[in-house]
Regions:
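RNase H-like (RuvC/DEDD) metal-dependent nuclease/polynucleotide-processing core
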Residues: 2-6, 10-60, 112-115, 120-249, ...
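Long, intrinsically disordered low-complexity tandem-repeat segments
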Residues: 61-97, 249-259
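A detector of long low-complexity, disordered segments enriched in serine/threonine/proline
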Residues: 95-106
Length: 357
């Protein structure tokens, strides 16, 4: 069904580029996921990720050519919390794995579908209060409406930044942020997926928390803006699971000689890298994933070969390791029966790929 599996460790931090954004790609088999370098040769930014995804969704294009990072229009005026893990300078050289997963770019004219996992919440909690923003007049009532709302409020913020949400009249009172430490409507609400993740391994922080080291809201606001833009750009060529159902392809057989319809060119799923480490029985705290032995054990748990002795992940919080484990987990989970099933709540709140229903 998929011939590429891309894990993206995300960042909602302010600015055109973030050291915390890292991309890693796996291909079918057991090969260790390999890094995708930014087009600038320096750091990824959210606009560059958006442009890469648009190109990757075109099965006839060589995704090893990420193009030019041109930035996006608008003035970055929001003021959110601090998205940690984005400090430092990324100066190393790496591999653009648009090709065979071994660092060789491909010029094939035909490509299969690509499964992309990104580390942010695709929606806010809904089912606990039957609303994203309980008590707020005009609160969005679907995930697509939520993305549209965030995009409209943040339209003057460049680089898909989402900080304007935290100061928006009405909406800002739901977010715990540096602007609003006493947010009157903030609650530690959890999505059904987060409750399930906690029960089986580990859960992320509340999606309305925009402050501190476990800030989730800043990245999620930026991410929902990007999803909105991807749907506007690509339409049905991209499916956002589980908000849009994905049916696994079945092999052609003599009893069924006609191949089923191809899946969309790209399927986006929500990931939580820490969950994949903890589900493997490993704790990545204090940069443990920088150790080759630790990372090899984690990758092996997801059916992947391990890293070499020269393994040195990028990012101040070894963010590249998060992208790598996610790519390996995507490849493994996508081959698991029932992986595309999700509870009814997921249609409004999203679901973390691989968390048991």
């Amino acid at each position: 069904m998929f011939d590429r599996f891309v894990g993206i460790d995300w960042s909602g931090a302010k600015g055109p580029r973030q050291a915390g954004i890292q991309l890693s790609m796996a291909v079918p088999g057991r090969g260790v996921p390999t890094r995708i370098d930014p087009p600038s040769g320096h750091l990824w930014g959210r606009q560059a990720v958006f442009e890469w995804l648009v190109r990757a969704a075109d099965a006839g294009n060589d995704t090893g050519d990420a193009g030019t990072d041109t930035g996006d229009a608008g003035t970055d005026t929001g003021d959110a919390g601090t998205d940690t893990g984005d400090a430092g300078t990324d100066t190393g050289t790496g591999t653009d794995t648009g090709g065979d997963g071994n660092g060789n770019g491909s010029n094939e004219s035909a490509r299969g579908s690509i499964l992309v996992g990104i580390d942010f919440a695709f929606a806010h909690p809904f089912c606990d209060e039957n609303a994203y923003y309980p008590g707020l007049a005009g609160t969005p009532e679907t995930p697509a409406a939520l993305w549209q709302c965030i995009a409209d409020i943040c339209k003057n913020d460049g680089h898909f930044y989402g900080g304007a949400m935290f100061a928006a009249p009405g909406f800002g009172d739901y977010y715990l942020s540096p602007r609003n430490h006493g947010a009157p409507h903030y609650r530690s609400r959890r999505r059904v997926a987060e409750l399930a993740a906690k029960a089986s391994a580990r859960a992320p922080s509340p999606t309305f928390k925009a402050i501190g080291a476990d800030n989730v809201a800043t990245g999620s606001m930026a991410g929902m803006r990007m999803i909105h833009a991807l749907k506007a750009e690509l339409g049905d060529a991209v499916a956002v699971w589980p908000l849009q159902p994905v049916s696994p392809a079945r092999p052609v057989s003599p009893a069924r000689p006609v191949s089923p319809a191809r899946p969309p060119a790209m399927v986006l799923v929500e990931i939580f890298p820490s969950y994949y480490f903890h589900a493997a029985g490993l704790n990545p705290a204090r940069n443990a994933a920088a150790d080759p032995g630790f990372m090899t054990a984690a990758l092996n748990a997801w059916g992947s070969d391990g890293v070499g002795a020269d393994y040195a992940p990028r990012g101040s919080d070894v963010d590249e390791a998060d992208a790598m484990i996610s790519a390996a987990a995507l490849r493994h989970i996508a081959a698991t029966p029932g992986c595309w099933q999700a509870p009814q709540a997921a249609a409004m709140e999203g679901w973390i790929f691989g968390v048991p229903v």
